[in-house]
Design a protein with these regions (language model features):
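N-terminal pre-ligand scaffold of iron-sulfur
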Residues: 1-55, 68-69, 73, 86-103
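Short cysteine/histidine-rich metal-coordination sites, predominantly Zn2+-binding motifs
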Residues: 56-64, 74-83
Length: 103
């Protein structure tokens, strides 16, 4: 397991980017205090994704598709294409000292 951060490093509704197995990834702390991580690439055409802590969604910059922060599933996709795949999740654990690790 690889340590990414500590809970104190990320406020509720915040995020941070990190590298996971050579790929850009994002760690998100939702307003409900869930900790999730995803490969930071849209499954449609590989566009960058951004976290919107106000709306609690992940947004693809290319086609404005939206993904649920809690599980990476498609929330809404562009009408120009059908998107059936959600974001690629990364297993996250938090230890008793609030350190955040990915597998």
């Amino acid at each position: 397991m690889e340590k990414i951060a500590n809970l104190d490093d990320i406020k509720k509704g915040g995020s941070l980017y990190f590298t996971y197995k050579g790929k850009k990834a994002i760690l998100i702390r939702t307003k409900k205090d869930d900790i999730v991580a995803y490969i930071a690439v849209c499954p449609h055409e590989g566009g960058n994704i951004e976290w919107d802590g106000q709306l609690n969604i992940v947004l693809c910059e290319c086609h404005l598709s939206l993904f649920n922060a809690s599980d990476g599933s498609v929330y809404r996709h562009s009408t120009a294409f059908e998107l059936n795949r959600g974001l690629t999740g990364i297993d996250v654990t938090v230890d008793k000292e609030n350190n955040i690790f990915v597998k």
